[in-house]
Amino acid sequence: PEAILANQLDIKKCNREGLDELKFALVVQSVMELPTTYITGYNSKRFDDELIRYLFYRNLIDPYRWGWAEGNKRIDVMDHVLLAYAFGRDVGLQFPVVDGQASLKLEHIAEENRFEARNHHDALNDTKNTKSIMEIIRSQRPQLFDFALGLVEEEVTKNRILDSNLLYHVGTR
């Protein structure tokens, strides 16, 4: 009910024009399993990916294949933001402070940086805000951007760990 209210969905319209869950899951699968797709989101590994897995599981679709098959990769832009925040905040982003602590929530970063898309928890606006963050990091700190992007490659990550004398962990947990 909260998501319906937050997204201002009309239940009657959804019932009239929407898809049943299995058909919806198959449409999502067909898009997410396109070869060499980079599935990108903000805080997606901790939220969206889990929802997709559960949707697929309930509908007897392999819940993990979409993230690795056909050369696909999962990118969580929040990981880029965490790296930017932890290793020099000179990336062109302003990091908001909420209740005395830095906030890396997408809506707070969007407000602090005056992004055009301000309707939070709207999928299209969240996508625009995520894209804005990536464009800023890529233009201001291309090495950081490329380093973080490389972390989606298993071999790259393994080699970085094995070749390094110094290892950092940056995360929310």
Each model region followed by its residue ranges:
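Glycine-rich, highly charged phosphate/nucleotide-binding loops
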Residues: 16-27
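A short, conserved beta-strand element enriched in hydrophobic/aromatic residues
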Residues: 12-14
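Metal-dependent phosphoesterase core characteristic of DEDDh/y 3'-5' exonuclease domains
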Residues: 1-10, 30-143, 148
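Acidic two-metal-ion nuclease catalytic site recognized across multiple nuclease folds
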Residues: 135-173
